Every structure is written in C-alpha cells, then in structure tokens.
C-alpha cells in the first residue's frame, strides 16, 4: 500500500472541523485504498457495494452503538437505500464518532441525499496523483502526464489502452447510469470523448451540440453529470465588472491527463502537448489545496488571458501563469490583467526542481515555482 500523507493529513484536518468527511473522486482514484490506510484497529470498514451492508445498517442506532472503533468508513455509500439517514444519525446521536464516506460523485449527485448535514460535513476531493506524490509511486513527471494519475495506470510499466477503455465503460454503467438514468451509452461516450479531445480549451455548448448532432439540453445535462461526478471541471471566467472582461465562456478540463492523451492519440508526447497537460496538473493542485473553491481564469475581449486566478481578500487577486518552460513566459496578458486588478501576487508555475525564486519581467514581480507551492500552500 502506497502511503499518501498529503491526503491523510487533509482527512485529519477535516475531521477536526466536522464529524463527517465526504471523500469524493472518480473511479479508481484510490479512495478505497486511502480509506483502508486508516487501519483496522482504528476504523470499521463497511463496503456498501455488498448486499449485507444494507441489512447491517437497517438499524443505524444499534449499528453505531455496537461500534467499538472511533472511525467508521462507508465505502461507496451512495449504494445504500437511504445514506442521508445513516449519516444524519451518526452526526446527531454519536457526535464523538468520525465518519468517512466515499463515492465517485458529490453528495448532490444522487436524489438519495438530502441537505441534512449542513455544517457537519467536509468535502475532500481526491484528485489523481499529485506531483508531490510521484516519488512514492516510483513515477516520473513524464509518466504522470502520459499515463495519468489514476494509480493502476500510473504504476503500469507501459501505457495500458485497455485500462482507459474499460474505465470509460465502467464509468457509464456504475456511475452515470445509476445516478442519472442516462440510457444511451453511445451518445454519452461521444460527448465525453469530444470533451476529452477539447480539454483545456473553451467549451461552447451550441458548438458542441452541432458537432455531435445532439440537442443543446442533452449536452447541458450530460456536462452537468460529468461535472457532478468530477470527471470534468468547468473553469469559469473571473470578472469584477470591468469593461471588456469575458464573463461567461468557461474552459473545460477533463479529470486526468492520461485520458486526455489517450483520447487525442498523443503517442509519444510532444513539447506542446506537455504544456497543455501541465495546465491540467495545476487545476488538480488547486482542487486538492483549496477544496470547495472554484477554479477561475481571466480573459478580456482583446484576447489577453491569464491561465488561473484566485481572489484573496478584498480587491486582491493572485495570478497564476503555467509554462512547461519558464523561459517561454510572455508578460503581455498578465500586464493587461494587472491594469484591472493591481493588487495580488504573480506566480509562474513551471516544472522546476528546487526552491521557488523571484524575478522581474517588464516591471512585473513574479514568483517562479513548481506545484509544491500549491500542493503545500501553508508550508
């Protein structure tokens, strides 16, 4: 079992704030392994995929009263008939108990969940392997970009095409169909594969519907399902009401670089491919470090674009530019952004080794750093 201290620390921090932690992430991202890393002495593990789990939890009060461990893990809890009731009883009647509930979607994904846990749960979004975890996996950054960060693919000696195909079929059958009752696998997969090929670019619903020959409402409902199940992140534009800012057009980032390179047929990777895939790793680092915060980008009508921005206090907005090579940075867009928002830090994120350092480019002060600055923002 690979030790993942980043996520273990995040779990403990979340439990210090609320009794229930919802560990969400796509299929095969390592949720079960992370849950089992708590150990049998500390935690009671319940696999909700098994029919016996429903019978075991028929009387939740009795179940929790008989539990002799401080932590209960409900793996794939959405498979239960009434998961909300189980979690509510745990939070209300057994406040000292800590619960880890896992699923491949957010709590909002299923009609089985009601909003009865306000203030008593914390979301932990388990993204594919972070750059800071690559040493533990025995993988290089090149492997992470090419294979992706789902542990079975990342640990494979060569890129396994069958893994990606099987995952896509399983994702539809076990997540999409069960949660949303979509029936047309061909139409759904056509949209998903289109999104994978367009990943990292702006996503226009009307253009997508036209390209695939399906209705706009169908595209919107399928995109919503992908977003809820965390297979897709829509990065929406940040704006403060300034004239000339883009306010509506989102960019779409698929959940894993391995699937993006697989769908695009990138074999081997070229330098231009690495730059786009590096952006995906930045999105995942944002999600891991600041769970619950939306990821934003900035663009004006003149075409100047800053890869990612993060508001940090009143009138203070940090800017993040991503480059596979730090030497390729062009400050034009960042200078335009700072005319709108003069306060904030500027980061140039590149796959550098060693410590972060500062530099000045055309009057702009930059911090050049790797993703460790995002993955460990408080250190």
Model-derived segments and spans:
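Pre-Walker A adenine-sensing motif
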Residues: 1-15
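Structural recognition of the conserved hydrophobic beta-strand(s) that form the central parallel beta-sheet
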Residues: 73, 98-104, 125
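Hydrophobic anchor at the beta1->P-loop junction of P-loop NTPases
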Residues: 23
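Domain-level recognition of nuclease-like catalytic cores that cleave nucleotide substrates
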Residues: 354-379
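Hydrophobic positions on the alpha1 helix immediately C-terminal to the Walker A/P-loop
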Residues: 34, 38
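Accessory nucleic acid-recognition modules appended to NTPase machines
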Residues: 158, 162-316
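Conserved lysine of the Walker
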Residues: 31
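Short regulatory helix/loop adjacent to the ATP-binding pocket of P-loop NTPases
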Residues: 107-122, 138-139
